[in-house]
Amino acid sequence: DEVNEALRACVDHGIYGYVRPSASCLQAAASWQQRRHGFQAKPEWITVTPGIDCAMATAVQAFTDPEDKILINTPIYDPFFEVIEKNDRVIVDSPMVLTNGRYEFDWADFEVKIRGCRMWMFCNPQNPEGRCFTEEELRKAGEICGKYGVWMLSDEIHGDIVYDGRKHIPLASLSEEFCGRTITCTSPSKTFSVAGTA
């Protein structure tokens, strides 16, 4: 009902352009991260975009330069390819390894290929597989990225949709160092089934 009421208020207002989010909107987003995931995001850290792909493209443009290399781990959400290539960046793939029905990082390959990259882009929970990465995996990836001065872009749009006692851990929540080098992309669109209403 709250979503429908908010949409009606927007329609009644009659202005359909992009608007600057209110302070209460940014505070609500930060508070949600704290309550749901224990991540103490600050409202002033939040930048609102029209969608997750736009958020990723904006981060790629802000934190890398044309011809910079960006590491991904396939299989991955298909728009990652487009975001990287349409912004004239270079894809470096460190494929995940299917082990006992579960995709895992190939750490040796990851560390070799991250050298010379400017950014690592990944999904957590992983899309298309849906697996939540463990704290150990996230820490290891974050430490490797830190060793080589690599920005980390974490697409966490499915972070609120986890089942069977699993827990979503935001990468940026694990340390101040990780927080300072992580761009977290999230959205209410999956959690509340409101895609296309931005």
Question: Residue locations for each model-derived region?
Answer:
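N-terminal small-domain helix-loop-helix segment of the aminotransferase-like
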Residues: 1-51, 58
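Short acidic capping loops at alpha-helix termini that bridge into adjacent secondary structure
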Residues: 41-46, 66-69, 179-182
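Active-site phosphate-binding strand-loop segment of PLP-dependent enzymes
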Residues: 97-166
